[in-house]
From Swiss-Prot:
InterPro entries: Ribosomal_bL36 (IPR000473), Ribosomal_bL36_sp (IPR035977). GO terms for cellular component: chloroplast; ribonucleoprotein complex; ribosome. GO terms for molecular function: structural constituent of ribosome. GO terms for biological process: translation. Belongs to the bacterial ribosomal protein bL36 family. The gene is rpl36. Its main location: plastid. It is found in: Plastid, Chloroplast. Keywords: Chloroplast, Plastid, Ribonucleoprotein, Ribosomal protein. This is Large ribosomal subunit protein bL36c. The keyword Cell inner membrane does not apply. The keyword Oxidoreductase does not apply.
Length: 37
């Protein structure tokens, strides 16, 4: 899980979701997991 100031989709499989006011990227590739923090 990468914690970044700005999250963006890395590949076409990345999905942008919001959980408890946090913007997160989930993907089948675990290297692409990000959240805004």
């Amino acid at each position: 899980m990468k914690v970044r100031a700005s999250v963006r989709k890395i590949c076409e499989h990345c999905r942008l979701i919001r959980r408890r006011r946090k913007v997160m990227i989930i993907c089948f590739n675990p290297k692409h997991k990000q959240r805004q923090g």
